[in-house]
Structure formats: C-alpha cells, structure tokens
C-alpha cells in the first residue's frame, strides 16, 4: 500500500476537477459533485484506486516486468524522466512516436543507431569520418536521444504503461490497448477513461 494519504491528496488540491461544462460524463462515478462551477473528485475512491494501481505495478516489477512512464506535457517532462530513472524504468518525455509499441521492431532501429553513434563518440572511432559528417551525427544523436533516449535500454515491450495525461497521449493508450498492455493513468474529470485499466481520478 502507498504512503500517500487522502489528506496529502487534499492538501495538494487533487480534488479539484475541471469546470462542470468541460466534464466527461464517463467520469461521473469518480466525482462527488459540483462546487462553484467545478467538479470535486472523490478522493476516498481515488486513494483506493491509487493503492490498487501501485500494487499492480509493484507485482509486475517483482515478476521482472518493465514499466514505461509517458508524460510529454512540459510540466511533467522533468518529473517523468527523474522518477523513471530513479526506479530503473523507462520513459517517453518529449514526443510519442507513432508505432512506438505497435511497431517496436522499427523503433529499435532508431535505438540501435543512437547506441552506435554513442559508442563511436565514446571510443573515438567517430573521428575517422569527415568533420561535416561528425557534426551531422552529433545532431542526429541529440534528436534520437530526445525521441528514444528514455527507452534505449528497453529490450522488449513493457509490462505496464503509466500515463500522466491520457487525453494528450491518446495514441499511446490506443497502441497499448491493441497489444493488451495494461494502462495506468491519471484521469481528470474531462478525461475519457475508456481504454484505461487502472484509473486514478484527480486533478492533473
């Protein structure tokens, strides 16, 4: 069970949803009701669902399953990267490339290219190329690191995906669904929770 309490969530303001005119009716089971034009999230339910999601993720990791954290919103990028690295897992923090899951073998080509450039830079073998080509490979590495750097050591599809904003990452949710990969996501009152296996209603 997580150490986060309902009081912690309340103090963080996670109970404030979106304006009532911007809600998704599918989120009704997770809402107390409106207050001053804003929907209030049922944090008692959020806490139970949060604990359930944590237990599910923990169980997968104990069974050597990997976790992919996805958060490309500017506000989430640094946190996603930091927390994924802290627990030895993987992340996408800038852009979700179409086919990142459903066409993973092709994505691995980009990962292999990134690792190849890194290896040449580290052992100095890149210096056998003309200066112009070295500069181009340097720029290519920056782009590849931005796009696939967070998954360059992910050898197979993840056991579970954790998503900060399922509205923004709808393609990731869709790809996971096609492959039967469970999705854990933060779901605000304006979210469509369909396709999300472990919903965590709260303000995003």
From Swiss-Prot:
GO terms for biological process: translation. GO terms for cellular component: cytosolic small ribosomal subunit. InterPro entries: Ribosomal_uS2, Ribosomal_uS2_bac/mit/plastid, Ribosomal_uS2_CS, Ribosomal_uS2_flav_dom_sf. The keyword Ribosomal protein applies. CDD domains: RPS2 (cd01425). PROSITE patterns: RIBOSOMAL_S2_1, RIBOSOMAL_S2_2. GO terms for molecular function: structural constituent of ribosome. Keywords: Ribonucleoprotein, Ribosomal protein. Belongs to the universal ribosomal protein uS2 family. HAMAP family: Ribosomal_uS2_B. NCBIfam families: rpsB_bact. This is Small ribosomal subunit protein uS2. It comes from Desulfotalea psychrophila (strain LSv54 / DSM 12343). The lineage of its organism: Bacteria, Pseudomonadati, Thermodesulfobacteriota, Desulfobulbia, Desulfobulbales. The gene is rpsB.
């Amino acid at each position: 069970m997580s150490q986060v309490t309902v009081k912690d969530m309340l103090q963080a303001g996670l109970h404030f949803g979106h304006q009532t005119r911007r809600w998704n009716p599918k989120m009704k089971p997770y809402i107390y009701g409106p207050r001053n034009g804003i929907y209030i999230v049922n944090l008692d339910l959020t806490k139970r669902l949060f604990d359930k999601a944590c237990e599910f993720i923990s169980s997968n990791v104990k069974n050597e399953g990997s976790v992919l954290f996805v958060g490309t919103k500017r506000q989430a990028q640094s946190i996603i990267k930091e927390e994924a690295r802290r627990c030895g897992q993987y992340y996408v923090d800038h852009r979700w490339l179409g086919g990142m899951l459903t066409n993973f073998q092709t994505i691995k080509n980009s990962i292999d290219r990134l690792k190849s450039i890194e290896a040449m830079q580290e052992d100095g073998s890149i210096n056998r190329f003309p200066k112009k080509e070295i500069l181009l490979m340097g720029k290519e590495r920056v782009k590849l690191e931005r796009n696939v750097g967070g998954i360059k050591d992910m050898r197979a599809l993840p056991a579970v995906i954790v998503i900060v904003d399922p509205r923004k990452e709808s393609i990731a949710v869709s790809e996971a669904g096609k492959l039967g990969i469970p999705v854990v996501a933060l779901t605000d009152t304006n979210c469509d929770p369909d396709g999300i296996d472990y919903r965590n209603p709260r303000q995003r």
